[in-house]
From Swiss-Prot:
This is Uncharacterized protein YLR363W-A. Residues 35-48 have a biased composition (Basic residues). GO terms for cellular component: nucleus. The keyword Nucleus applies. Present with 6650 molecules/cell in log phase SD medium. Keywords: Nucleus.
Amino acid sequence: MPQKPLKVTKKAKDPRRVTKKQKNLRKAAPLQLKSKKKSLQHLKKLKKSSSLTETTERLVASKVGHLELLRGTRKELEKGKKNSK
């Protein structure tokens, strides 16, 4: 008669238990890499949202004509007029 491997059922782990990550939260946190050069440390503080805001405003202004925002710079408007002629 052939023998099968035993079926081992694991006990369900208690959901209230504390894991290693919960004990030491500093290890689980993402790494904050700091540049060693003093001249580059200010770059970490910069937010890159200004160009995104500008492009969004420009897009909205070009789609809606009655806004007080410009549709672009003067040079861009002149190029558009030349291309349309």
